Amino acid sequence: MAMTTEVKDELSRLVVKSVSARRAEVTSLLRFAGGLHIVGGRVVVEAEVDLGNVARRLRKDIFELYGYNAVVHVLSASGIRKSTRYVLRVANDGEALARQTGLLDNRGRPVRGLPAQVVGGSIADAEAAWRGAFLAHGSLTEPGRSSALEVSCPGPEAALALVGAARRLGVSAKAREVRGADRVVVRDGEAIGALLTRMGAQDTRLIWEERRMRREVRATANRLANFDDANLRRSARAAVAAAARVERALEILGDTVPDHLASAGKLRVEHRQASLEELGRLADPPMTKDAVAGRIRRLLSMADRKAKIEGIPDTESAVTPDLLEDA
């Protein structure tokens, strides 16, 4: 089951005792899932949702809170409709329901955002407003780099009302217009978790958090592996470059190179991938890695000085891009 469906399924089964919160949820769900239509001179309230559980919850709440019967029509998946949809309609008492839920104001005009009683209600009402909005048009992506909790909104006023409700819950949400559609987005992982709990999807939050932690552990392991690989590549390139410079130094100095420097240089050339510590153990007699490094440094310095005096390519000239690319 996708994360969005898991959240909606859990929210649709949530038991809410507060009448005010239940009313706020119904109002928000109707506002975000549908709208008001004039049919034959009458106001009809409609809401379209993607889960049967959500449609049944909304129908039950409308009847228990307002006493109106709603009819649910099932639109089966076909053609461009990828999944089954559920359309809830209140026709006979549409105007009365719209006024009581605050979707119409006292003058009978549609409210563009969320009604004042929801926006200025209690914290439980703010939670319910988010719950209704998510049940209507919410989505939750899997944890990851682009994880987000989003709600598609019917307009900018509704989006701003939802942002305000999130702020009251201590959650940072942003209103965005994407391809002409208004959305409210929460991207921070901690904020997503907090909002899931606030809405009432605690079980799904635990699943989401577990997946998030697993992904972070994998990402950390991958970063460390990449870091180790990069270090190995750098070390290999450095060893190849050092061996090439030593080879050139031995060419420049010829028979004039001191024996102790020559022996250290030959070790570097013969064992290109070995570390300085390993070269020290291979020396006869064995040396510390600092002693090996010191001798190679003096060998290169001596060769570069001679190359400068004679006007010939120095040891750095042996380190070509092709050489490092093959390392």
Swiss-Prot record:
Gene3D superfamilies: Homing endonucleases (3.10.28.10). GO terms for biological process: cell division; regulation of sporulation. Keywords: Cell cycle, Cell division, DNA-binding. InterPro entries: Homing_endonucl, Sporu_reg_WhiA_N_dom, Sporulation_regulator_WhiA, Sporulation_regulator_WhiA_C, WhiA_LAGLIDADG_dom. Residues 275-308 bind DNA. It comes from the Bacteria. Belongs to the WhiA family. Involved in cell division and chromosome segregation. This is Probable cell division protein WhiA.
